[in-house]
UniProtKB/Swiss-Prot annotation:
This is Glucosamine-6-phosphate deaminase. It comes from Mycoplasmopsis pulmonis (strain UAB CTIP). Belongs to the glucosamine/galactosamine-6-phosphate isomerase family. NagB subfamily. CDD domains: GlcN6P_deaminase (cd01399). The active site is at 68 (proton acceptor), 137 (for ring-opening step), 139 (proton acceptor), 144 (for ring-opening step). GO terms for biological process: carbohydrate metabolic process; glucosamine catabolic process; N-acetylglucosamine catabolic process; N-acetylneuraminate catabolic process. Keywords: Carbohydrate metabolism, Hydrolase.
Length: 256
C-alpha cells in the first residue's frame, strides 16, 4: 500500500504525523516505534509531548529504535542523536529508559556495534511504525548515495554534501567538528524490519529529492526511492515538497 498525502498547511502535516504515532500506541500499547532526528520530526515530537501531557497517552510499554547515530561523538554532546531524542521527546514522556535503543556513539568497535544493533532489531521482531525523513541528497537514515539495497545496519561514511548541510544548519561550527561517520540502519533493514513506514518531507529544498524518491525507479543514488518497494509506506508531504511532482503522481495523492 502506497499512500501520498499532501498538506496545504504545514501545521496540519505535523498534526497528522503525530496522529499516526498516537494511533499506533492506541492500537498496540507495547508497540515498537522507530524515530529519526533532525529538523523534520521536531514539531511532531512537540505534539507527542503535548498529547502525553494533556491526554495522558502512556509510553511506559513502548520500545523505541532510532535510525542512526554519529560515530565518535560524546553521548552528552548536544548534537548526538541520543541527546537530541531525550531533549526533544523522551525526557518528557513516561517511556522506560531501558527500552530506548540508539546505536552507541562512543563504541570502541563501531562495526560490531552496528551488527549488535541489527540483531537487536531482529530479536525484537522488527519495528511497528518507523518515522523517516529524506536528506538533501535523497538519503534515508544515513544510507548515503551509492548504498546498496541489500545493506544491513552498518557504519556509513558521510558525504561532503551531508557534512556541509550539517554546518549550514548550525549543527556544527566547522568541518573539523562534524563527525565523518554514522552507524545507520541499512536499506534492507528498513525495508524488511519496519512493518509500516511514514515518510515525512516538507519545504522547497526537498522538492527535487521528493520527486526523485517517488518518480524515479528505485536506485542507489537516491536511497529513499527504495521505499517504493515497501508494502506499507505512507508519504506525508507539504505542497512545497510536492511542487515538482508530475500530474500522474498528484492524481494519486490525497490533498488535505
Amino acid at each position: 500500500m502506497r499512500e501520498i498525502y499532501i498538506f496545504k498547511d504545514l501545521q496540519d502535516l505535523h498534526k497528522f504525523s503525530a496522529k499516526q504515532i498516537i494511533d499506533q500506541i492506541k492500537i498496540k500499547k507495547d508497540s515498537t516505534l522507530g524515530f529519526a532526528t533532525g529538523k523534520t520530526p521536531l514539531k511532531t515530537y512537540q505534539l507527542l509531548v503535548k498529547d502525553h501531557q494533556e491526554n495522558k497517552t502512556s509510553w511506559k510499554d513502548i520500545t523505541s529504535f532510532n535510525l542512526d547515530e554519529f560515530v565518535d561523538i560524546d553521548p552528552s554532546h548536544p548534537e548526538s542523536f541520543i541527546k537530541q531524542m531525550k531533549s526533544n521527546l523522551f525526557d518528557h514522556l513516561d517511556i522506560n529508559e531501558q527500552k530506548i535503543n540508539i546505536p552507541k556513539s562512543n563504541s570502541s568497535n563501531p562495526d560490531q556495534e552496528a551488527l549488535n544493533y541489527e540483531n537487536k532489531i531482529r530479536k525484537n521482531n522488527g519495528i511497528d511504525l518507523q518515522f523517516i525523513s529524506i536528506g538533501v541528497n535523497g538519503h534515508i537514515a544515513y544510507n548515503e548515495p551509492g548504498t546498496p539495497k541489500d545493506s544491513l545496519t552498518h557504519v556509513s561514511n558521510l558525504t561532503k554534501e551531508t557534512i556541509l548541510d550539517l554546518i549550514a544548519k548550525n549543527k556544527f561550527s566547522s568541518i573539523d567538528e562534524v563527525p565523518k561517520k554514522a552507524i545507520t540502519m541499512g536499506v534492507k533493514t528498513i525495508l524488511n524490519q519496519c512493518k509500516k513506514i511514514m515518510m515525512v518531507s516538507f519545504g522547497k529544498e526537498k522538492a527535487q529529492v521528493t520527486k526523485q524518491m517517488l518518480e524515479d525507479k528505485p536506485n542507489e543514488n537516491v536511497t529513499a526511492s527504495f521505499l517504493q518497494e515497501h508494502p506499507n509506506c505512507i508519504y506525508i508531504l507539504d505542497k512545497e515538497a510536492a511542487s515538482l511532482l508530475n500530474e500522474e503522481t498528484l492524481k494519486k495523492a490525497k490533498w488535505i
